[in-house]
Amino acid sequence: MENKKSLLKKLLKTNLLPLAFLGDSVHTLIVRENSLLKDDVKMASYNSFSSSKCKAQNQAFALKQIIDRLNEDELEIVRRARNAKPKHHAKNSTSADYSFATAYEALIGYLYLKEDQDRLIEFLNSSLE
């Protein structure tokens, strides 16, 4: 299996939707892990919390909250991912929210493969607030 750095290099040369796919998985994992840290919560509440935090609207909002803190490389990832043309979008979101959510997920995937844990945690925490 390729290491993270070489995979990142490969993905940056192409469409960023695979990076968003990875970022969505990372985001979902952290959200679910965070929900388990809450005391005495029923399973239905875990699912409800996770579902609410993983919606396109929440991810779009999170990106808008952090956009002023992004460096040039991160802004380029966001720009390219927003301009990507997915074949569909979530039925419960607008195409604008879906576009921003895709950009947020691509950014998370980028930071994960880049192994920039500090930035990754900083930005993931913004989506949990």
Description of each model-found segment:
Residues 1-129:
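Double-stranded RNA-binding/processing signature
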